[in-house]
């Protein structure tokens, strides 16, 4: 230490009597080891993993476990929970991590990475004029991510979001109106989808793109399909906007088969924290261990109007349900796989409530149907958006006379068929043949068994199994299926199903802009801008 004391005065004298110009002083502040050029291919792949809640920000289970599963799957009554795990959507309780996870991970993960790609491919960036397809694919990913944020929270920072990365030191972005964000996102989808072209140089895009492997035609279909989703989501509050963009989506070309589904592949390696399916990890015994019991609402729907026969059963019953079974880290042990005996757990109940309903001490594992474990392997793919949704939205648009869509019955039947036949990506044994779908459609004729819009809403709801975030949004907008709310003593909503997430406490306390532009009141029953049902 004494040498430092002696050296310091000498250094100070040297600085005082040394002539330095401003440029030399400026250079002293530049870190010669700082990274100022990055391989955008790696960043793009990370952004794609991020939309599957599997990006670079930490636990790949975190957002799925707390929000997709804990809130959404239970609130829309696909799953039920009578103790254990994370399930604020079952009894309408509060979990601060459930509220925070999508906000924090979306901004800090995929949107951060996408912002870097857009910055470096814009004028002045080191890849300016290059990677045009990657740039426009990133705009589509960005629209997907912001749509989800708006649908969860309402108003969010958008136009000035993620600008802390561009050197502007813009650390407290304003909140923007949801309607303005939606309009800009639709414009972005329109421009980005149209601009993608197979004739442009690849420059590593195909290798970086793990969703479509650089297939520009599929990217364009996904962009226009997202446009259709967002336009229909705005249809009750801005008819002109919906009409314009449904028409553009149809003209641009939406998904036409399950081969167009947007799917992020997963893998077992290099570790459980990297590349594995976060939904599966949340449920897998010995890892997440979240209970996997299916809701009575869902099982009753899949068993058809007559529970005493399989004649009108939905062919997805024993695809979504693996049966009544015991699942441990060591083995999946079926107890009862008879379709007639499948039984869902009622939502909003505790163990003592189940005992009272059943008239005996209930062993949950031996009583209630579980999610099929074949859909919950750690390397199972993660489906982001499916073709079935597109056909069902086109059926709704045709039924309501929006955007020039026509032939609602054909679109509905194509949507149901696609929804029944998309699960073989998890395991070949989950394939549903055409005969089974034909029988189901014949037993449930479009617009006859129930009103057409109700049938469309119910099919959208069941088609989003595992993609519970979007099922929650569909239910909030359409109002089908008719769900009976729970009213548990610990609930915070007065017996109302939650209709939005609350902002993270860190955002409330840390961003001064929250006070002037956020959606208020900041509670679970405030409706986002498109929710009129």
In which residue ranges do the predicted regions lie?
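Glycan-recognition patch characteristic of GH18 chitinases/ENGases
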Residues: 54-57, 62, 73-79, 83-86, ...
